[in-house]
């Protein structure tokens, strides 16, 4: 980072608000970025918190203009969003004085009408250059681009979201095509600085900068880990998820000759909380506690339960085994499948007592994690499993945790042919013509989530509103079948050829 910008940044965040930073040549354009913020409160260990980010924003604003942006993923998923559908996040962002947001893929977890309601409640602007209603009309109050004067410079902003399996009422077109069009518009509008607010992979961001030299800066999200990368001197920056850090970017110069300085700002207990934002966060947390009811112990676990996606999205996991065992046992199905993206928790559940609140946090998607039961032939079940292991090769949420069967797969083999040998149930191979009763979550089984297509589930899906919640099945299983004590579930269900399962 440039030495002068570094010193200004240090003064901003160490309490020296009254001290003027040393002058920076020309008037700078400054951004404060957060991304993938699913909870407004602090995370485990006391890190993060939008109230602390608001303090940083205020200190920066006291020194000069700063544009505060969110690069997607905030309205879902979380246990609060399961019940309040993102209202708590919008209210916190409003109090924190957010300026701009773009869509992350998880904004589309909400029904479109619900998302439109959240946008209407926002006192900040939503910008998306590639996501619209299915017919191509704009999502209400969402702009494809915007310009804003910052320190005398005309700054153009646009928003991009990665393509994905979204609800049918939403369409997100190819981000690169959308970017080319919107950059043409911003150039014609006379923008001095063009900034992309993106929610896609870092590699997609790099490719975009390499193809489009008129984009000066990308403020991104999606990976959950801080990043500062450059392409021809132009930065791609991302912060850590859940506001455990923010990125502070300073640019000075002029059109075609911008200099850039980037600083990662840890959000920790050393930063005071903004009073107004802290009050909003506390009110929503109190509301959630009342909704969930008294904390009660469901049982105890002799092993830590780790929901880390680095494990569960590529291999069998102990937590996945526990959940699928619960679903299979409590529904009476032959086989239970859970897409790994269902299991979300921002902490490890340690060995010891486990409460109803712990388990509610594990399933933040609400009705999407209801479970339906339906028949599949052995041949169709194998195709479903093939789809799941292909998701595992990519490390996505479509990788399946399973109960009631076992199989081996080889990620080096071609997609659709990665299962090695038989799929086995109860010690014998499942034949193509066998009829298997399968319990599966509503999101993949009924809504096509993660690319699953299961017409066999249509009759069960017609009753999905009354289907049991996975969290209720799990609580019943722990307190009933397990006698309140969780021990290591049987593993070696999903075996990767040549590897030992991490568990």
Give the ranges of each region predicted by the language model:
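Bacterial N-terminal signal peptides
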Residues: 5-15
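Acidic, metal/ion-coordinating pockets
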Residues: 16-283, 287, 314-326, 336, ...
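Catalytic centers of hydrolytic enzymes
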Residues: 24, 28-30, 39-42, 54-59, ...
